[in-house]
Amino acid sequence: MSKPVRMEPGVKLRDGDKMALIPVKFMPDPNEEVLRKPDWMRIKLPPSSQKIEHIKSTLRKNKLHSVCEEASCPNLAECFNHGTATFMIMGAICTRRCPFCDVAHGRPLALDPDEPKKLALTIKEMGLKYVVITSVDRDDLRDGGAQHFADCIKQIREHSPQTRIEILTPDFRGRMEQALEVFRETPPDVFNHNLETAPRMYRVARPGADYKWSLELLRRIKEMHPHVPTKSGVMMGLGETNEEIVQVLKDLREHGVNMLTLGQYLQPSRHHLPVKRYVPPAEFDELKDVAMGLGFSHAACGPFVRSSYHADLQAKGEEVK
């Protein structure tokens, strides 16, 4: 009999330890044959560069986190080489345990009250003109962390008034009203919240989340701040159908969402949900045409597209694949 996993404050649980705590009957079979990556999914990673090392050392120096590293993003080298990073606030331990995600699960530590200012000064030091701020889920906080997002927005605007700010938020489960009150006074320049997958896949892929709740959050933000673009991201390759994805796009548009990212799911480890299929680039192109036909102002669709991948270009309406 396996030893029960202990939840100690500040301890990161990953891979098998994290997956053992997911309260769903279906679990990936570690012995299941892994699909071979097709040619279009093979990229040559650039060697480490001064820019990559500078960004990593800057983050370490200021005790900050990037989702690029914590979620093992395949675009890390490209983005860091371009001098961009997506900052992850409120620590690197998530209270959720989604089996597609590589961010660690556990009991997070208390918020760092100095983080908003440290983040703002780091952004100023790096000379960033467009930043994406995301976070782990913090179901332990009364407002789900909304005020901490707002504090970061205020500090960035104080120290770098020309910098545009996109936030990629959790769903504020059970705390939507508190979060909306916070964002009423401190909206970002772009509000992003990912649906991640089709509703049929939620029980397996997003335990603890609710498809309709996420759509309602996006709708309420748009209703409150009509001038703020709203954005959402979806993965493919978890077992959904293209027809289900098209319905997700329709649902997003019906809830006022302006911008879309659509990319290929990649399995972080053998303990995570397996890739059920690799979607050919031509299908992403077709889905982009569908998205634009539905009225999205911008749709970044391609195998390596992620929520914050070239987010500055997405916000300008430039082509991203």
Curated annotation (Swiss-Prot):
Q: Where in the cell is it found?
A: Cytoplasm
Q: Name one Pfam family in it.
A: Radical_SAM
Q: Where is the Radical SAM core domain?
A: 80-297
| Catalytic activity as recorded in UniProt | [[Fe-S] cluster scaffold protein carrying a second [4Fe-4S](2+) cluster] + N(6)-octanoyl-L-lysyl-[protein] + 2 oxidized [2Fe-2S]-[ferredoxin] + 2 S-adenosyl-L-methionine + 4 H(+) = [[Fe-S] cluster scaffold protein] + N(6)-[(R)-dihydrolipoyl]-L-lysyl-[protein] + 4 Fe(3+) + 2 hydrogen sulfide + 2 5'-deoxyadenosine + 2 L-methionine + 2 reduced [2Fe-2S]-[ferredoxin]
Amino acids binding [4Fe-4S] cluster 1: C68, C73, C79, S308
Pathway terms, separated by semicolons: Protein modification; protein lipoylation via endogenous pathway; protein N(6)-(lipoyl)lysine from octanoyl-[acyl-carrier-protein]: step 2/2
| The name this protein goes by in its record | Lipoyl synthase
Tell me the superkingdom of the source: Bacteria
